């Protein structure tokens, strides 16, 4: 039920859920990171929403593709924190 993410040359991770008001489609994520405890999410062209456990749960980008809402903090299941990433449908 969560969105599946992939890192560039790193381990994958699974987000716990999706933002309310989205299409319900999985979002693919790519991120760069350094050891830490969170992952930053930003919107990118074609994006629908940030992760379900983002800093502002319930925020949706539906109808506003390409709008950048700013960094979101998402708990890292892999112990890797990093720079903002794009979540795209």
UniProtKB/Swiss-Prot annotation:
Residues the record marks as carrying a glycan = 3, 7, 14-15, 23, 25, 27, 29, 34, 38, 42, 47, 49-50, 54, 59-60, 67-68, 73, 76, 78, 83
The ranges of region (Disordered) come to: 1-89
- Its name, as the record gives it, is Submaxillary mucin
What superkingdom does the record give? Eukaryota
Q: Which UniProt keywords apply?
A: Glycoprotein, Secreted
Q: In which tissues is it expressed?
A: Expressed in the submaxillary salivary gland.
Compartments it resides in:
Secreted
Species of origin reads: Canis lupus familiaris
Q: Where is the composition biased (Low complexity)?
A: 56-71
Primary localisation category: secreted
- A GO cellular component entry from the record: extracellular region
Q: What is known of its domains?
A: The mature protein contains tandemly repeated, identical sequences.
